């Protein structure tokens, strides 16, 4: 798994964080200063990259959290096999199967020989854009 670490206080909207083992995109960060002897707390709301589920993280701002390293690649669609797509990476020429995206905007553009951008996050792949 390719991850790095940062503190909760450094998270911004649009950044990525691992919550419950799932890579998520941060959509909201609120910070609350507690009493005289307590430390500041942060409430992070994020949406799972693969599941689309809403997740929350409540933690002190100085707590370490995992941040996934996102590898962006370009590939070419070789075959459409129902709910999966066979893709060839245009840099390494490796072929692999990847799940077809559920978004109608992406699914309508999928056809053989089309180029696509996919992300590899924590050993899993996701189609982000079809050219």
Swiss-Prot record:
Q: Which SUPFAM superfamilies match?
A: Nucleic acid-binding proteins, Translation proteins SH3-like domain
Q: What does this protein do?
A: Functions by promoting the formation of the first peptide bond.
HAMAP family hit by this protein: eIF_5A
Tell me where it resides: Cytoplasm
Q: What is this protein called?
A: Translation initiation factor 5A
In terms of SMART domains, this protein maps to:
eIF-5a
| Main location (coarse class) | cytoplasm
List the GO molecular function terms. Answer: ribosome binding; RNA binding; translation elongation factor activity; translation initiation factor activity
Which PROSITE patterns does the protein's record reference?
IF5A_HYPUSINE
Its GO biological process annotations read:
positive regulation of translational elongation; positive regulation of translational termination; translational elongation
Spell out the InterPro entries in the cross-references: IF5A-like (IPR001884), IF5A-like_N (IPR048670), NA-bd_OB-fold (IPR012340), Rib_uL2_dom2 (IPR014722), Trans_elong_IF5A_hypusine_site (IPR019769), Transl_elong_IF5A_arc (IPR022847), Transl_elong_IF5A_C (IPR020189), Translation_prot_SH3-like_sf (IPR008991)
């Amino acid at each position: 798994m390719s991850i790095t670490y940062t503190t909760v206080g450094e998270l911004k909207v649009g950044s990525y964080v691992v919550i419950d083992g799932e890579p998520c995109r941060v959509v909201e960060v609120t910070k609350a200063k507690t009493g005289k002897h307590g430390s500041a707390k942060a409430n992070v709301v994020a949406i799972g990259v693969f599941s689309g589920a809403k997740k929350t993280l409540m933690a002190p701002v100085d707590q370490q959290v995992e941040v996934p390293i996102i590898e962006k690649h370009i590939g070419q669609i070789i075959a459409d096999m129902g709910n999966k797509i066979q893709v060839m990476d245009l840099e390494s020429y490796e072929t692999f199967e990847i799940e077809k995206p559920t978004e109608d905007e992406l699914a309508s553009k999928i056809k053989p020989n089309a180029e696509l951008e996919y992300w590899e996050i924590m050993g899993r792949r996701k189609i982000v854009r079809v050219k």
